[in-house]
Every structure is written in structure tokens, then in C-alpha cells.
Amino acid sequence: MKENEKPDQKMYYRMLGGTGLQVSVLSFGFWATYGVKEGLTNEEGIIKAKECMSLARQKGINLFDNAETYGNPAGAAEEIMGEAMSQLQKEDQEIWRRSEIIVSTKIFWGGTGVNERGLSRKHINEGLDASLQRLQVDYVDLLFCHRPDPFTPTETIVRAMTDVVRSGRATAWGTSEWSAQQITEAYWMAIMQGLEPPQFEQPQYNMLKRDRVETEYHPLYQQPYQIGTTIWSPLASGILTGKYNDGIPEGSRLTQKGYEFLINNLELHKKRGSIEKIRKLADYASSNLGCSLTKLALAWCIKNKNVSTVILGITNPEQLKENLNCLSVTENLTSEQMKDIDEILDNKPEPYAGFGGQGMRQIVTI
């Protein structure tokens, strides 16, 4: 190491629920980046993905997250990730050995045909086969039901996912943006029939969206469920970087075709007074922690022990290096500072009451 050069930040790992798998607390995601943004498609996208994925592995990241619907056209992100990973494995077989890499994808939105989306047994099987081909792998470690499917019986979904896991095409399966009730129903349906239960959930979680992860899912982190979480949008699609405080910069995610719904989210946060809170958080991060708001927002997510991993949207190496520095912020965040942050946010959910909480009928007697 050169004089005055800082040592590499240590990567941390957590158990992903009851899967037995250890995942890096920061992971690499492909949503709204590769296969979509200018300069990140086709061959150019593969080159840039390789550069970022290579650095990610060197820094200890072991989970790479994708979905059949990511990219334009759908599946383009999987193709870029698959080709980049294939080339990297040939260039450095040791660091990219398959036994150390965790690959995840999600099934729900496939093609435009009536049977090319949803969670029918047909689409789960055909969608996964297509994803495996694009990713250039024999199996994925984590397979998610990208959303709940109200038109397919839960038992059908559980049986199809069980078949996928037991056929060796996925190591384990989980859900994304399912309610606690839906996850619980699927879990017990699997357990009672000797099938494979869901073992992880991918919810949105950040300083501005807390209720589901901190309250609704609370019972699911305990026995017997032991659900792990791979959280997405830790920066609220960039809102928590502060770059949208004074408008929408050209070339940002909110200007991309197909992501117009994010503008509605921004407007909603403005109405709720979130931008003023973000300014205060940025000042607090700078004056009390000596870091950027981005680092604080990521560190805050990791500080929650029920978060297994935080998915990053990385498009260049410098961005990755910056994000990795959030780990040192996490190490130094005190309980008093977390209370200060809660006071600024003023959105802490009510603690989970459980079966003995205020929601129960009380009997007053002597």
C-alpha cells in the first residue's frame, strides 16, 4: 500500500434469512441502468458493466440482482449482466468462481402476450428458462416473485416455485413487494404440504419509506419464518442524494422514458415537505458525520439489522467507490445520532404491537 493511501474498507456480510447464504451488505443491481440508459446498452453496456462488476467483486460484493423485465427491451439487462459475468469468469476464475457468486432474478413481467406475465406455473418455468439463457447460468441462487399475482392461487405459485427449487434451477425462492399476510399464507401453505417456503423479500426501503420493513414485516424476521430482505431504492430513486432539490437535472433517472412515474413520487415528497427534511439531513451529515447525504442514507439502511443487503444502482466505478464509503459511516453511527435523524425525518413508524399490543381488546376488572 502506498504512503498515505487508505486501506480498503472492510465488506460486511449478513445471513439471508434462513437460506444459509451470506450476502454482502451492499449488492449490485441492474434496475433502470444497464440496458436502458444511453451509453449502457449493447456492447458499450457490457464493457461498463464489466468495469463496475469487477470492482464490486474486488471490494467484496457477492450479490448481483436482476429481473426478466429490466432493460429496454425487457431482458436486455440480464443479457448485459450475463455476458459481462461470463467474460469476467474467463479473465479471473478465482474471484468469479460460481460457488462464491449469488445471482438473483425476478419473474412476473416477461413479454407482452397474455401468458407471458404473472405467476402461472407456465410463466414461472418459461420465464426462468429464458432468464437463465440470458444470464448464461445453469441456475440462479435467488428467484423472486416480482409482485403478488391476484389471479393465480397461492398454492399454484408455491408448487411451481417448489418444482423450480427441487429441479436445481434456483437455490431458494422469495417475494418482492408482497404483504406480510401474503408471505405468511405462502409460508404456511408450503410448510403444511411439505413444499419449499419463501425465504426472502425484496421491498422498497429508505428514509422516506419505512412502514413495511420496520413494522409490517416485523413478525417475519423471527422464527419460524426467518425472512431475509434485499432492499431496493435505498436512495428513493435519487431523491435522497439531494440532486432533485431544485429541479430535475437533464440525463437523470427521472428524465428516462418509461420512468415517468418517479416524477409523481418526487411531487408527492415535495407536498409532504420531504425536500426540506433532505436539506436538513444533508447539513446534519456534513456537520456531524463529515459525509455526504448519499453515504448517510445508505448507512442508515444498513444500520437496520433486519436488512440483509442494500441494492445499489451502479453505473460507474467512482460512484461505487463513493457508495462503499458508507460502510465506515455505518460503523460510526451512534444511537444518539440515529435519534437525531429520526427527529429530522419525523416519520418513524409505530412499533409493532404484536398480539399483546394496543389493538387487542382490554378487560378492566378487579
Residue ranges and their predicted role:
Residues 1-101, 138, 166:
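N-terminal binding-site loop/beta-alpha segment at the start of enzyme catalytic domains
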Residues 3-6, 45, 148-343, 363-366:
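Beta/alpha (TIM)-barrel catalytic core signal, keyed to glycine-rich beta->alpha loops juxtaposed to Asp/Glu
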Residues 32-47, 110-125, 146, 150-152:
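Active-site mouth loops of central-metabolism enzymes
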Residues 40, 69-80, 111, 149-153, ...:
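Acidic-and-aromatic substrate-binding clefts and catalytic sites of carbohydrate-active enzymes
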Residues 42-56, 117-135, 183-188:
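Short, acidic/polar
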Residues 63-68, 104-105, 139-144, 174-175, ...:
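Short beta-strand segments at enzyme active-site cores
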Residues 95-111, 201-205:
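A short, structured active-site edge motif that brings together acidic residues
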Residues 132-153:
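Active-site groove signature of glycoside hydrolases
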